[in-house]
């Protein structure tokens, strides 16, 4: 839980961490188990703030039902070479929405960059003069049923969902600096059932994806190899597992089964 400061910054007031149940690869399989997980985590976080209740919830979502693509759109300024205003910009962004199926919903439309009369590299064209405005946008879409179920299960705890956010974007906001986004960076967040990826270029998300493989698959593989029960294997993995950075040049071909990438 957090409070928004006077300059828009977040001040963390409390956190609640509980073991997740009822979700498989980003999809709800047992709504009651998920509801109990959400309730328990919120109760734990509220211990830090007393009797106060959150005014709203921003929930991150993952899962292979989420897809993304980059689109381009252009629109002429009706004022010819007049100032570009926010109304024209909103019209431009709405036009960048791709055609979605009956069970699909647009989650995010994030401008990557604008062009005004052929001039590239513009972050915010509002107030500039120009007759033709173009945008390249990163669009994230998801299964509308899955997204609605996510909102439904959270709101059964009497909390109000203000917005759903792509999990990898939330991870990036929590871990990256502005300079890292500008230089170019990849965020890889390995969860239990999925791995979430987002690529930043010149300060904006350029690519995002969800891979249906996570830590749970590693636990199962270890369980088979070690011939130990799943719960014991998970404990061993968490307690003793490490990831050691190794230079690519120090790897031998046979160590990667000739699959060098």
Model-derived features with residue positions:
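Short beta-strand scaffold segments in enzyme catalytic cores
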Residues: 1-2, 196-199
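Extended, hydrophobic alpha-helical segments in both membrane/secreted and soluble proteins
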Residues: 183, 193-197, 218
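Short, glycine/acidic-enriched loop or turn micro-motifs at the edges of active sites
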Residues: 192, 255
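Nucleotide/phosphate-binding catalytic cleft detector across ATP-hydrolyzing
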Residues: 3-187, 204-206, 215, 226-252, ...
